């Protein structure tokens, strides 16, 4: 192998002696002697050695170990076995081999799967990434013992391949006959096997360069290292990089498959923990005490400061980042603590921007889109291993985001089958797979933040929210909060938004060059290296508030302070650790408010309800109140936390969209009435007021509107009277003509006959006049027809619009 130096026996013994001197450090600090004694007492056979210690004691040997791993590791492991034998000879005989695992600083050999190139072959490297695939654990034969009944002899054979540290692999043929063709029987009790597993680690998604796919590398785990990692874990793997020749038909191709033979697997913290100093903790405590009254509002305002408005949505996202308290009850049931939020609304209301902010702020977040995600891609897939042909599990986005946040954009574009796949994850926090002979359960305890557009592209305010949303109740009830974000035309608000957006475009970060594109991620691939001499004094001081900038924050908000993003991350990280307990007062209040929500749900119409009020809503109230208490750094959930949670739920569940629409219509009616005052007499005004008085009780009714019911006087009826067309003005003028009861009754009968003959729900004015007067002895004049239609319109029996009569 290129770059490999084969040690002769003399050099091997010298290396073994050096490593033995390193381990026998009783005269020094006695670190490794105590570690070996612990290894014996714990019945282990792998010793973890810090490379930095070896480098300080014998730099030459440390460099050789990193650059010529196979021979040096063999010498190191022999030295370890000799050292164990010197302490406990009987224990050393229990195991055939003792293993050495490495940790510490690897310098240029600390790489990611992308930078793992051919120059690292036969070297010890430290690779970090995220586990995407795991094979099943299989036993692999190390030594087989065979008995020949004919000759009464026992044959022993050892096996080694390129996945071991032995330089020359042995034949892998399993003997069935001896030299004289006598059959052999395998003595399974005397044979030795080791556990064998293959995993694939992939470059971390946030560290992959822009425009390039994440790379991956196969890792071989043996003995005690198997099952150290599962799909979704972030790990550091220290091992030897080796290439395996691929033989096809007796020939070896010029390209080789490479693997990493692991000697140590270290779990990285699933949360990208910010480094804390003592000053940071003191600042967090001081901030929570000084701003105890309005701390929740202060933090919510500082979330996504580049987005104007959406105060309630920001409060909900802050609750999502903090989370509730998860509970595993004695009877085996699990109550989730993660908060799920769905944002539904018109285009261009900053839904996707809010998702992107969460991606940057949350300690662990995975982005996906509805169209680019399948059900198995979100949960877990069973794939076939190309080499062995066996089935294995591959983790999906929600498993990879365990204890984090999954942001799903364009949620409405997903197919129904894919959406149903995430039902179990959103409530139980796990993925259960029972496919192709594999039955597995993976943890996926993640919060879901989803954004979707309404069914019709834009939100139709004349349809119920359930019709606009178009998702199943079973899915909606799993979302704790559902926000309808509307793009409403309000001149004052539009002016504020335009001012805010223009300031954002004029703002330039310090040091930004002319014409330079802002980087989306970190330009440098930051790898986590353990530094034993790390001191926190080198840390930069974290500022609580951002420095005020007129362009960035606006001139009107000089008094408002924005919490800096760095401090926000640290504050959320500390606040998540707290587990507040419900007080009796808050528990009683939540129970009362829940029963009120249920009764409000049954009394009010469907138009006001955005998602079903179920028993999950009660858990939602508890989770939101707990998150609010976490924001205050409180150990108890008090009444103010419960009140804030109820306010959020009231806003999200019962957003009275149609009421706002009615106010706008009323305003437009008032404006049109002021114009009519100049043109019409006082008598017309009084009649209009009378008609509006008879109309007002109708608007208060909460039931849905049925266009085929004569007696129906529902809340959508104001829509009938809104347009001020020429026909409606003629109708008001024609009200001066009084019709007798008999004449009106005759008109109604004739009108119904005309509609019956036409087999239609609408008919034109000219056709109506012609049909009514065709067989009538006393024809109706146009003024009489207008007066009769006006009377029937007031009684909600017909609707006249642009010369067409609609039967209601």
Swiss-Prot record:
The modification N-acetylalanine is found at residue 2. The modification N6-acetyllysine is found at residues 293, 547. ATP binds at residues 523, 664. A motif (Arginine finger) lies at residues 477-480. This is DNA replication licensing factor MCM3. Residues 295-502 form the MCM domain. It is an enzyme of class 3 (hydrolase). Its EC number is 3.6.4.12. Keywords: Acetylation, ATP-binding, Cell cycle, Chromosome, DNA replication, DNA-binding, Glycoprotein, Helicase, Hydrolase, Nucleotide-binding, Nucleus, Phosphoprotein. Belongs to the MCM family.
